[in-house]
Amino acid sequence: MTGGRFDFDDGGTYCGGWEEGKAHGHGICTGPKGQGEYSGSWSHGFEVVGVYTWPSGNTYQGYWAQGKRHGLGVETKGKWMYRGEWSHGFKGRYGVRQSLCTPARYEGTWSNGLQDGYGVETYGDGGTYQGQWAGGMRHGYGVRQSVPYGMATVIRSPLRTSLASLRSEQSNGSVLHEAAAAAADSPAGTRGGFVLNFHADTELGKKKGGLFRRGSLLGSMKLRKSESKSSISSKRSSVRSDAAMSRISSSDANSTISFGDVDCDFCPVEDHVDATTTETYMGEWKNDKRNGFGISERSNGMKYEGEWANNKRHGYGCTVFPDGSKEEGKYKNNILVRGIRKQLIPIRNTKTREKVDRAIEGAQRAAAMARTKVEIANSRTAHARAKADAADQAALAARQECDIARAVARELSPDFYQPGPDYIKQRCQEGGDIKENPEEKVLEKPPSPKESPHFYRKGTTPPRSPESSPKQSHSPQPSSPEPSKKQNPSPGARLSQDKQSLAEEQVTAFVNKPSMSKAPAKELGASVSKYSGRHHVPNPSNGELHSQYHGYYVKLNTPQHPPEDREDDRGVSQSSSALVPRPSPNKWGPPKSVTKPVAKESKTEPKAKKSELAIPKNPASNDTCPSLEKEANSGPNSIMIVLVMLLNIGLAILFVHFLT
């Protein structure tokens, strides 16, 4: 056998022994452009046993066959390590994949590099799943056991909770980015394995008062559903939306917001959950989620038996609460949409009861099947651990062959650069820096906007994007004054017309009634002083008029207009003033006092004068007080009319809903 160094056209190099033109014995081979390195034993051009090192520092130590990893071996990839069997370059049949930083691990069977068959997955928080797998996901029958609730709420990292099952084919050995992001964004990322949730009955009992309280007549009417075979969403009553139903329905008083493993959108606060409470799910799984029949039970007595869909109670089932009360019927996304004991007239309770009973029986069968699958999974796990121990021995043999190959390469070509040790050293240094200064690394991750334009927030402009900064930062500013300039002239013109008409009205009123007492002037002065800090009012009469019309005081410059236009302007002011809210009643003293001299002159007809206050006068008249009082009296009447209409509509809807 001869040996030496051979440089390939792609930049790779082989340094070691060869026979008949093929690598044979011990040697080192680097990949294209010197990237990657295999060091170990060879047989007629193929690797046999040795160590392969990637530029990132990831390594494989074990056996090979036909240029692929085959047999027993250990792969270190990122923060994960796989120990076990390999088949034609993929993980399988038995093996253990574990995290180097947390207790997260999978022990069981593999196929094509993914969990497949039976296995046990232990999560970073200590929770476990035991059962069947397919394509790297929980699929079949299995049991999910959570940790105590207090621990599940403390551990927040998605890597530690690992609610989605572990994956094996990643570029850097970490959890899939989308799965990690989903777990981080979801509330389930902080409460691994808990899918049942209920609120305290005391607080919700206080909120549910009145006609729609729990168990009342109208509350039962509100919960009745159409027994159609079509979708529930198409038959939902128009009285409420989905969100309203989730807040008002009777199921919300005891339970029903649920945590999915990955796809929850909100995080309701649980009440009165002991820190030692645990939860167990036994049943069917599909595509890594609870689907089919199953039983979820807490150690505090809460239990659900029935159908599931996407980690939520969906279908027929029965929920038992810690206080012993039950909730039976049909669920849709964790909400009871068709209850048995909540209906006003239980006409079709028999059919619903049969469906609930069948669902409970199916859930119990699925739980029993899951327990049998757990036994098989535990036996597969024991075998996988034995293969992992054997893989450790294979890795030790591979390291020994690697050392021999390096010695042979140094003898044949002393100037040959071996990149493998540098790759490993660089990775160890990076890992040591992270362990020594974890706080500094955390502080360096969110860089300032100058360093990272990716953290651009609305309203800030990174310095590295000068082209986009004028458009984003300055474009909203000039656009805001333009609408105000366009809108100001039209209301201003109307305002000036109303001011002029009202001012002329008041002037004519004072001219026609010279015998006015001095008391209104004092009241006007008091009302003016109240708003003197905001507006300067030179004429108290004008200020009083505009406080009645606008609710604030405006300085007026009343020009002279032809007398024939006064009636038209007065009509416009009266019609427009009806649309404006009325001020407090104490400001209407002056108009009332104006009518006193008239009452003294005509003492023989006091009742007739009083009746005139409720009758609208001719627009040509100068006194506007009765029309203003009519406007004040019309406000409560319109409110009462609207309330009566709403009450009639509500009763009609309830009656129709009861009939359906």
From Swiss-Prot:
The lineage of its organism: Eukaryota, Metazoa, Chordata, Craniata, Vertebrata. It is a peripheral membrane protein; Single-pass type IV membrane protein. SMART domains: MORN. It comes from Mus musculus (Mouse). One of its GO terms (cellular component) is junctional membrane complex. Belongs to the junctophilin family. This is Junctophilin-1. One of its GO terms (biological process) is muscle organ development. Disruption phenotype: Mice are unable to suckle probably due to defective E-C coupling in jaw muscles, and die shortly after birth. In skeletal muscles, triad junctions are reduced in number. Mutant mice developed less contractile force and abnormal sensitivities to extracellular Ca(2+) were observed. Sarcoplasmic reticulum is often structurally abnormal. Residues 437-454, 562-571, 598-612 have a biased composition (Basic and acidic residues).
